[in-house]
């Protein structure tokens, strides 16, 4: 699949995921980062990587598709930074030592506000995980069209808490990997893709 128009590509992915019943029927995926069947397994694939095992601080988008990523980070004793939805309330830091026994609850959007604290100063980030609508094998990433993911990554670079070689991953369904994602100058690239079946590294 190779489309030059971002909106057309988003609509195509959303339509396919709904038609093939890959997206969560309780949360229509149009206009969203899709919550897909297999998101738990994709998080598990990411969890099995050396990049994950070495990471002490994980940054995650607040999307439902990445909820297991956030839960696994806390269960594995990693500090977790979550962007607040639409970045309306900044960034939230969750300490695994303070949520023991409540990792599942703390990994939700509501739970992050309950158990976490707003970040005043960023710690170094070892792994970034973003949600995506579509990705390609050159690192192109397409979000839902609001530029939140790009803004988050740019902010982390600006704060000097990530470097060019920091793993920037996404968890997606195989159907979300396309031939080419339209990329503009402001778009931030990823370098890892985890699906329910495999992990792909982009060099």
Model-identified regions with their sequence ranges:
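Conserved phosphate- and dinucleotide-binding cores of soluble alpha/beta proteins
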Residues: 89-203
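N-terminal active-site beta-alpha-beta segment that forms phosphate/nucleotide-binding
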Residues: 2-119, 123
